[in-house]
Structure formats: structure tokens, C-alpha cells
């Protein structure tokens, strides 16, 4: 079978059946090996086909060539030599139109940003955006008129059977593009106006880097805070004047304070900068801290001893005149300044002499800080003995 290869549309549908190459016309032999604008005719030797002893008469193909007026640059598909259809031409126009729209949007946004950066007011920006929108609408109407004229010309040329649907598609697309583009332009105008208004309000509210709103809101609070500071200073000076006689205050309020009060907090001072403390002061501070701890521990132990003493004194099975109960009673009197007048009994005198506590008259005791550890140990011993008696 001999096949003539040509363009995809014109020459592919012709074939030869049972062709004798000797009987091919001279025109085919002359054209063999020559090209028609890129299309080459080739020859292939195949066996002749017979049908029950009778040869089939050969057919001469139609001499079809490519039209010389076709411009290959106008064709959309590279492998096709046909003219572009009306839809393809309108599609190319629509692409050009969309490119113009996007280029217009980019120019408009750049110009508005530059005007905002230069400090243009909101009124000029609004006029500018309105003018740009009007220009864009004029351009869009001109382009739509151009599309309509192209559609009318294509209808008059005889290929208008396809155009109603294509024209409707293009008009709908243009309508949607117009709506979306106008919406985008309006949104850009709103954003520019908001940014310009925000910048002007910030410049009005603040001058020379000072925010007057913050000063107006914080100044009353600062004035309110300054008053308690002055009051605290007066209170501290008043307390210092009252606590000039440290010995007297320690005698009267040594055991009357609450047990939960953290007395050593006054000595836990935090200081960020490096501070050189003399060794004597440091050792004295440790000594005072230890003594305060002993006072706090003695106050807690006295409360527990008082509870155990009341339980043991309420029961008749134990001798109330025993040595343990007497010492516990003397320690409780020693811890309460209101009972200093009752320390003249034998048990109280024994404890005072044992721990070298001096009784000055009937109203005060001369306590030494060095005796607090011994008093704490004795209180713990009495508590253990009372627990044994109760159990």
C-alpha cells in the first residue's frame, strides 16, 4: 500500500489500495521527492492486491496544496495550518483586555502608595482614585465596543453560526471582570484613606515623641501614689522614734506577738549591687538571726505546753503538786508578762535561778538572749513528760 503523507487535515485521509507503481501518472512521479511548503511526498513499494482475478483500477489523488495566503504566525496551534476560528480570535482579544486591566490596577496602586508616602491629604486621594476609576471605566467601555465590532464583522463574514454563544461568553466574562476590578479599586481606596487618617490622628495626638494621653492618664495615678509614699516615710520615722528604747519594747512584747509572724524577714534584705559587709557586722547579723529564731521557737512551744498542761490539770488521777506540773506552770507564767507577779513561788524561783533570770521588782524580768536555747530545751522536755502522763 502506498501512502502519501501531508498535513494532518488535508492529506491523511487519502490512501491507495492495490496500486501498481508503474501505472502511477507522471505528475505523481514528477512530484515525488519534492516538497510543498514543508510537506514531502514519499513513495513506498507494496504488493498489488487482487480481488478474484480482476485488478482494481487505481485512483488518482486530488492535488491539494496549502493555501498561500495563510500566515503561520496567526495560527494558535503550531502543528495546524488552518485559520484561527472566531472563538480563538475573540479569546486573544480577551487576554489582551485582561492584561490591560491588570496593568492599570498596578499603576493605580503604585501611584496611590506614593501619594500616601508623600503626605497627601485624604481629599486629594479620594479625587485621584475617583478620576482613575472613571478612566478605567472609559477604557473598559472602549474595549467592549471593540469586541462588539469584532463580533459583528465575524458574523458578516459568514462564520456567525458560532458567534452567539461565544459573544455571550465574552460579555459575561467582561461583566465579571468589571465588577471584580471595580471592587478591588474601591477596596484599595478605602485602605489608603484609613491609613492616611490613622497617620494624621497619630501625628495630632503625639508631638515631639510625647504621648499626652498617656501622661494625662498616668499623672493622676502618680500623684495618688506619691501621697502614700510620703505617709509611709512619716510612719517609718514615727516607728523609729518610738522604738528608740529597744530594751523596753523587747521586754514587753517578747512573747506576746503571734507565732506565725516571720520576724527574720527584716534581715533578709535583697540588694542587687555588690555590697561589702564587715566581718563583725556579718557575724552580729548571724547572731541576731539565730536569737530571733529561738524566740519564735519558744513562742510556739509555749502554746503546745499550755494545751498539754490544761489537759493534765483537768484529770484527777495525776498529782497536781507533782514536780512536772509545777515547772510547766512556772514556765507558762514566765512566758506571760501579765503573770510576773506570781513568780514568787518555789517552782518559779527554781527555774529563774536555774536559767539565771533576774526578777526586777514585780513587773519585769531581765532576759538574756543566751538563755533562750536552754529554755526551749526545757520546754520540750516538759512536753514529753506531760504526754507520757496523759497516755
From Swiss-Prot:
It comes from the Eukaryota. GO terms for molecular function: GTPase activator activity. One of its GO terms (biological process) is positive regulation of primary cell septum biogenesis. GO terms for cellular component: cell cortex of cell tip; cell division site; cell tip; cytoplasm; cytosol; division septum; medial cortex. Residues 49-68 are annotated as: Disordered. InterPro entries: Etd1. Keywords: Cell cycle, Cell division. Pfam families: Etd1. Involved in septation. This is Septation protein etd1. It comes from Schizosaccharomyces pombe (strain 972 / ATCC 24843).
